[in-house]
């Protein structure tokens, strides 16, 4: 569920036509990074956007009527439930990086960058809250494949592997119909 909340923000960027690529890496089935190439979180609001309730950038915004995220609550929940949480916002030639440990701000730094705009989130769920957890590759890959079917043109890189659906659900429907057509004959 935590991973889904982070990815939903990236999907919202895609739906707003701000980035068509998302990169997800899972380390040792315990830690996750998600990088999108959308607009990036406004750097002046970055700490608030990931740690203070009722401060999400999508809250009350007509631009996000089709938002799949939790309107500003998702990243805050991931932060609160993580032993380590890091977010970077790339905008206007700068990257602002902040790090939290168990919800407490530890570092906040802004530097110049030539990297593309977007957002990077890295987190490790708190094992005192989630006993014996791990991210299961098959479940994560199925979830990501579903995202590409529901969002034609979206490219997701998962641990270096490309997951893409050119035609979204249209391709799934065609494949499904062809399979049943063969069975009927």
Predicted regions located by residue number:
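GHKL-type ATPase core
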Residues: 30-33, 37-40, 45, 58-170, ...
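Conserved beta-strand-loop-beta-strand hairpin that lines the nucleotide-binding pocket
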Residues: 8-59
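Hydrophobic residues in the alpha-helical elements that line and stabilize the ATP-binding pocket
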Residues: 6-9, 74
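Conserved small/polar residues in nucleotide/adenosyl-binding loops
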Residues: 175-182
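Active-site catalytic microenvironments for nucleophilic, acid-base chemistry
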Residues: 13, 84, 88, 182
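Conserved short strand/loop->alpha-helix "switch" segment adjacent to the catalytic nucleotide/phosphoryl-transfer site
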Residues: 1-4
């Amino acid at each position: 569920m935590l991973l889904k909340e982070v990815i939903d923000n990236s999907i919202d960027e895609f739906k707003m036509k701000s980035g068509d690529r998302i990169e997800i890496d899972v380390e040792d089935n315990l830690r996750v990074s998600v990088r999108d190439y959308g607009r990036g979180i406004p750097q002046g609001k970055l700490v608030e956007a990931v740690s203070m309730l009722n401060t999400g950038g999508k809250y009350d915004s007509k631009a996000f009527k089709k938002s799949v995220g939790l309107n500003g609550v998702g990243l805050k929940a991931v932060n609160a439930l993580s032993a380590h949480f890091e977010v970077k916002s790339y905008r206007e030639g700068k990257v602002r990086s902040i790090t939290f440990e168990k919800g407490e701000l530890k570092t906040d730094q802004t530097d110049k960058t030539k990297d593309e705009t977007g957002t990077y989130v890295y987190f490790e769920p708190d094992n005192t809250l989630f006993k014996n957890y791990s991210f299961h590759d098959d479940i994560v890959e199925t979830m990501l494949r579903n995202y590409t079917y529901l969002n034609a043109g979206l490219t997701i890189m998962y641990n270096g592997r490309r997951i893409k659906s050119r035609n979204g659900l249209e391709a799934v429907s065609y494949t499904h119909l062809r399979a049943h057509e063969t069975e009927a004959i």
